[in-house]
Curated annotation (Swiss-Prot):
Gene3D superfamilies: 2.60.120.740, Galactose-binding domain-like (2.60.120.260), Glycosidases (3.20.20.80). It holds the Pfam family Glyco_hydro_35. It is found in: Secreted, Extracellular space, Apoplast. Glycans are attached at residues 107, 272, 303, 376, 398, 782, 787, 817. It catalyses: Hydrolysis of terminal non-reducing beta-D-galactose residues in beta-D-galactosides. This is Beta-galactosidase 13. Its EC number is 3.2.1.23. One of its GO terms (biological process) is carbohydrate metabolic process. It comes from Arabidopsis thaliana (Mouse-ear cress).
Length: 848
């Protein structure tokens, strides 16, 4: 049929109107479905440069956040803050012993709701890296492997062992099939772009020889055979079999990583440790943000395109989930602290780094790399596309003590000691790893007024058994005895002493000697408490030895073996042993009496209070509680009630006056505490213990404590609210202005404003405002946030200037230059290079 041109135009118009009408008639749900269907599936591939998502090369900034270490109520805010910190990916382990604590019985609810966690990440527009295990280490009890696995006949963990492979394959398929059913893989339109099987296997591979290599090949084939449409990695595994990508773990992968084992694989950094995990008995340990930023900039300057901060938020080892001797608080010095609060300047300085690297994105992903070495201490690495304006440079000064000058393309740059300056156009410095522009915060633990009202502690003391029926001829190994059902295992034995044994010898009383493989031990003889002993994370074995008074006839020895978690690393974990190994009486008239193999031993697992569940409301009435006298022996349960701390700030309990034990709030396990194990500085490693708000009710919250040690003072315990309302700035007058002043447009770096200058930015959290300026000095002040002092040079008007810019505001910006702080245009110390130190207090408006 032939159509005239006028008719043709009319027909096109009619069709267009119909289509528009149809589109307008779609429901909002239909529109959403239509939008989602457009970009539903994502193809993830890779080459020697980067991961490629839907045909687009990506720079990936990832952070480790472990779902069981925070509560579902905390997840949204933590993920949101991670995104605001410049991350585009979240990495998590999958915890086998969380999901399958009993063989064949899976749990994916509450803090174990992996699907919910991943969907929240997806909702925030972030990618996911799923580190599947089966072994994860992670300072988590048993490295994430369930206890029951130890009791599978003929099993050897993490090697070419059929029972282990059989259970691993079953577990892996349960998890991956669940992810697939929920359409969470990128190939299905979900957020999971990368997977990991096994973890740092090279650390144990030599112990298993050929079986170790066979196991790694088997693990690789297992996940690739499931055809999930994502790449897979193995970290610290340089011989990772194709197509597996070998990735780096460590603090300085830009210098320590030998690179991918094939040219067609990208350089990925799966763990950049943001601090050092803590164990009981440790002094404080930190890693500076300057060092982290330096390491990341160096890695990206040397072909790296993916970094993961381990941890970005550490969280809490609730209940008994920490590995041996590891504190309840985990990676608290990460960019988001244990409570999910932004730890500044670590959070902000890394955010600025991500901004700077994004300005370099085109050059890093498509440019040709070049390297120049002006001196032994300096290095220039740059990427450019010939014939275009695309160019980015990294000027590195590796001198740890002094600044160095670097001449690049006709211009001289002064680079501070051990730092890297980033030039996203090969001309303009927008960021230096050693110059912190972001604000600082100091964390405050404020005693709660509501929660600390007249504690009325009641107590229940465990009976110490003198004789448990049993026929073992040696003390049973403690891991196998407790089976991860309790931290505690009782051991009893009896022995006879005659008059000849008690005859006086030079050297005084006989000595009881107990050699233990760990972790801690309490000892009674004939009902009298003799004391306790313990090992450490570095040296688990210890000896308990003490002079004792024996009686003629039968004597009764009772020992309580104590665990602080299962081991989380090493080869042959299924054969790792702990607990008392040899027991003897030295100095008897007849010589040494060996009780280890010549006596029958009785054993019992756990406390009566654990068996009855008296840590929760429904179990309280199963025992008789008495009013606390203040002279309780060890092995005592304490309970009281308290109201929730005021405000919605994070909450914690401070365990002053206590020794060692476990804490529950409303039946929820807060974790292990150990106040009596002091660091070399003479202080407990951890004092405050996080109580998530979701554990609390407005009133009458049940606090239950099991305390191992005698003579404690529970009246010294208090509840605190946690904030970061102390906000500071510490900026040198010659620092590089914030990267936020810059953007990239048409392959060029351009200033967002006409006036690019250095400023100090202070910001309160939430709806709070700056209520006081506690310190201000433009000169050469000393100290850190929360502890500043004046130096020899100080502009007298410093505090007045800061108050003018900041008081009563939620956020303020202070110009950092001489003209702002000069009085009558006079510089009282012109030869001093100035720094501005400011400390303010944030608070809520009293009217509110």
């Amino acid at each position: 049929m032939k159509i005239h041109s006028s008719d043709h135009s009319w027909l096109l118009l009619a069709v267009l109107v119909i289509l528009l009408s149809f589109s307008g008639a779609l429901s909002s749900d239909d529109k959403e479905k239509k939008t989602k269907s457009v970009d539903k599936k994502k193809e993830v591939t890779y080459d020697g440069t980067s991961l490629i998502i839907n045909g687009n090369r990506e720079l990936l900034y990832s952070g480790s956040i472990h779902y069981p270490r925070s509560t579902p109520e905390m997840w949204p805010n933590i993920i949101k803050r991670a995104k605001q910190g410049g991350l585009n990916t979240i990495q998590t382990y999958v915890f086998w012993n969380v999901h399958e604590p009993e063989q064949g019985k899976f749990n994916f609810s509450g803090r174990a709701d992996l699907v919910k966690f991943i969907k929240l990440i997806e909702k925030n527009g972030l990618y996911v890296t799923l580190r599947l295990g089966p072994f994860i280490q992670a300072e988590w009890t048993h490295g994430g492997l369930p206890y029951w696995l130890r009791e599978v006949p003929g099993i050897f963990f993490r090697t070419d062992n059929e029972p282990f492979k059989e259970h691993t394959e079953r577990y892996v398929k349960v998890v991956l099939d669940m992810m697939k059913e929920e359409k969470l893989f990128a190939s299905q339109g979900g957020p999971i772009i990368l997977g990991q099987i096994e973890n740092e296997y090279s650390a144990v591979q030599r112990a298993y020889k050929e079986d170790g290599l066979n196991y790694i090949k088997w693990a690789s084939k297992l996940v690739h055979s499931m055809d999930l449409g994502i790449p897979w990695v193995m970290c610290k595994q340089n011989d990772a079999p194709d197509p597996m990508i070998n990735a780096c773990n460590g603090r300085h992968c830009g210098d320590t990583f030998p690179g991918p084992n094939k040219d067609n694989k990208p350089s990925l950094w799966t763990e950049n440790w943001t601090t050092q995990f803590r164990v009981f008995g440790d002094p404080p340990a930190q890693r500076s943000v300057e060092d982290i930023a330096y390491s990341v900039a160096r890695f990206f300057s040397k072909n790296g395109t993916h970094v993961n901060y381990y941890m970005y938020h550490g969280g809490t080892n609730f209940g008994r989930t920490s590995a041996h001797y590891v504190t309840t608080r985990y990676y608290d010095d990460a960019p988001l602290d244990e409570f999910g609060l932004e730890r500044e300047p670590k959070y902000g300085h890394l955010k600025h780094l991500h901004n700077a690297l994004n300005l370099c994105k085109k050059a890093l992903l498509w440019g040709q790399p070049r390297v120049e070495k002006p001196s032994n201490e300096t290095e220039i690495r740059y990427y450019e596309q010939p014939g275009t304006k695309v160019c980015a440079a990294f000027l590195a000064n590796n001198n740890t003590e002094a600044a160095e000058k670097i001449k690049f393309r006709g211009k001289e740059y002064l680079i501070p000691h051990r730092s890297i300056s980033i030039l996203p156009d090969c001309k303009t410095v927008v960021y230096n790893t050693g110059e912190i522009i972001s604000h600082h915060t100091s964390r405050n633990f404020m005693k709660s007024k509501k929660a600390n009202k007249n504690f009325d502690f009641k107590v229940f003391t465990e009976s110490v058994p003198s004789k448990i029926k049993g026929d073992s001829f040696i003390p049973v190994e403690l891991y196998g005895l407790t089976k991860d059902e309790s931290d505690y295992g009782w051991y009893t034995t009896s022995f006879k002493i005659d008059d000849n044994d008690l005859s006086k010898k030079k050297g005084g009383k006989p000595n009881l000697r107990i050699a233990s493989l760990g972790h801690a031990l309490h000892v009674w003889l004939n009902g009298e408490y003799l004391g306790n002993g313990h090992g450490s994370h570095e040296e688990k074995s210890f000896v308990f030895q003490k002079p004792v008074t024996l009686k003629e006839g039968e004597n009764h020895l009772t020992m309580l073996g104590v665990l602080t978690g299962f081991p989380d690393s090493g080869s042959y974990m299924e054969h790792r042993y702990t607990g008392p190994r040899s027991v003897s009486i030295l100095g008897l008239g007849s010589g040494t009496l060996d009780l280890t193999e010549e006596n029958k031993w009785g054993n019992k697992v756990g406390m009566e209070g654990e068996r009855l569940g008296i840590h929760a409301e429904e179990g309280l009435k199963k025992v008789k509680w008495e009013k606390a006298s203040g002279k309780e022996p060890g092995m005592t349960w304490y309970q009281t009630y308290f109201d929730a701390p005021e405000s919605q700030s994070a909450a914690a309990i401070r365990m002053n006056g206590m020794g060692k034990g476990l804490i529950w709030v409303n039946g929820e396990g807060v974790g292990r505490y150990w106040m009596s194990f002091l660091s070399p500085l003479g202080q407990p490693t951890q004092i405050e213990y996080h109580i998530p708000r979701s554990f609390l009710k407005p009133k009458k919250n049940l606090l239950v404590i099991f305390e191992e040690e005698p003579n404690v003072k529970p009246e010294l315990i208090d509840f605190v609210i946690v904030n970061r309302d102390t906000v500071c700035s510490y900026i040198g007058e010659n620092y590089t202005p914030s990267v936020r002043h810059w953007t990239r447009k048409n392959d060029q770096v351009q200033a967002i404003t006409d006036d690019v200058h250095l400023t100090a930015n202070l910001k309160c959290s939430g709806t709070k405002k700056i209520s006081a300026v506690e310190f201000a000095s433009f000169g050469n002040p000393n100290g850190t946030c929360g502890n500043f002092t004046l130096g020899s040079c100080n502009a007298p008007v410093s505090k007045k200037v800061v108050e003018k810019y900041c008081l009563g505001k939620a956020e303020c910006v202070i110009p950092v230059n001489k003209s702002t702080f000069e009085q009558d245009k006079k510089d009282s110390c012109p030869k001093v290079e100035k720094k501005l130190a400011v400390q303010v207090k944030c608070g809520r408006d009293k009217k509110n």
